[in-house]
Curated annotation (Swiss-Prot):
This is Conotoxin Cal6.3b. Expressed by the venom duct. The modification Glutamine amide is found at residue 50. Coiled coil: none annotated. Keywords: Amidation, Cleavage on pair of basic residues, Disulfide bond, Ion channel impairing toxin, Knottin, Neurotoxin, Secreted, Toxin.
Length: 52
């Protein structure tokens, strides 16, 4: 069974491109440090998961 695109966490740059809501719902594996370094939007939802 093939995975749909949104079943897999997207890279941070994809989340930024799609917008904040995408990051919340589709980018759960988004690495906070990596995102901050690259200047990407990181939702508070992700910050909590990363232990800030």
């Amino acid at each position: 069974k093939k995975k749909r695109g949104w079943d897999t966490p997207a890279p941070c740059h994809y989340c930024q491109w799609k917008g904040p809501q995408c990051c919340v719902y589709y980018c759960s594996s988004c690495n906070y440090e990596e995102a901050r370094e690259e200047g990407h939007y990181v939702s508070s939802h992700l910050l909590e998961r990363q232990g800030r």
